């Protein structure tokens, strides 16, 4: 997947970033470390994170997170039967009026459904089996989907290997607020939905992509409670 093919380009790197509604801070980069705020993740950075995944399963997981802007729990529920020619069928966790959503893929991700089905065929997955399965089996001996924690770990470790980091909004094991920290899945969702709004000016499209019952404009600015 070439980042330049993505039909929805992210905000250019180096743009002023907004950590809150009152002030702006410039993106910081260095030879050893470079990091950006959530809205500053560029297609190059996203592609670097995806390429830093250590296996095909993890690369496909990161590609789906980026292409769909879906919640981690929604992506982990993906099965071979949910993969269609130009869209993916995902559960909609937060909208009781629409429990399933069709997420159409941008032109740059046109090969993603085929890649997912090849992965499923190579591993002999049944139509109802989770595509992103763990090495551990379920109580019935069947394949078990990766957990949310495992998915976050996969993306964070790939981000560290790619040396793509963001400014932390609160303290973590990676350091104090304002210190560089690895990217995480929620940032892919923020960046994708925000980028659709900015590049297309199509609020209904962003609303459908996110699976919202209404467009939450406040969601497009990351707050402290939405950081790690």
Predicted segments with their positions:
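DNA breakage-rejoining catalytic core of tyrosine-based enzymes
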Residues: 21-47, 96-110, 125-129
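Basic, Lys/Arg- and aromatic-enriched nucleic-acid-binding interface segment
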Residues: 43-72
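Short, leucine-enriched amphipathic alpha-helices that occur as contiguous helical runs
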Residues: 46, 57-59, 148, 152, ...
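Basic, alpha-helical nucleic-acid-contacting "clamp/cap" segments
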Residues: 52, 85-87, 93-142, 149-162
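Catalytic-site neighborhood detector that most strongly recognizes the C-terminal catalytic loop/helix
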Residues: 94-96, 210-228
């Amino acid at each position: 997947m070439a980042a330049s093919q993505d039909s929805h380009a992210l905000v250019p790197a180096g743009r002023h970033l907004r950590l809150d509604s009152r002030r702006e801070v410039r993106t910081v980069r260095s030879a050893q470390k470079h990091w950006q705020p959530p809205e500053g993740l560029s297609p190059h950075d996203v592609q670097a994170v995806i390429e830093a995944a250590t296996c095909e399963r993890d690369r496909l997981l990161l590609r789906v997170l980026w292409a769909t802007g879906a919640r981690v729990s929604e992506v982990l529920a993906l099965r071979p039967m949910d993969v269609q020619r130009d869209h993916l069928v995902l559960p909609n966790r937060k909208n009781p009026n629409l429990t399933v959503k069709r997420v159409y893929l941008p032109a740059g991700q046109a090969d993603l459904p085929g890649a997912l089905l090849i992965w499923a065929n190579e591993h002999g997955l049944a139509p109802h089996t989770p595509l992103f399965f763990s090495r551990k089996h379920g109580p019935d001996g069947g394949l078990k989907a990766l957990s949310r924690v495992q998915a976050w770990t996969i993306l964070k470790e790939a981000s560290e290997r790619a040396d793509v980091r963001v400014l932390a909004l609160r303290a973590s094991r990676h350091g104090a607020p304002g210190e560089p920290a690895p990217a995480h899945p929620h940032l892919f969702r923020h960046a994708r939905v925000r980028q659709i709004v900015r590049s297309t000016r199509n609020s209904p499209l962003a609303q459908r992509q996110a699976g919202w019952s209404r467009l939450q404009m406040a969601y497009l600015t990351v707050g402290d409670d939405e950081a790690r």
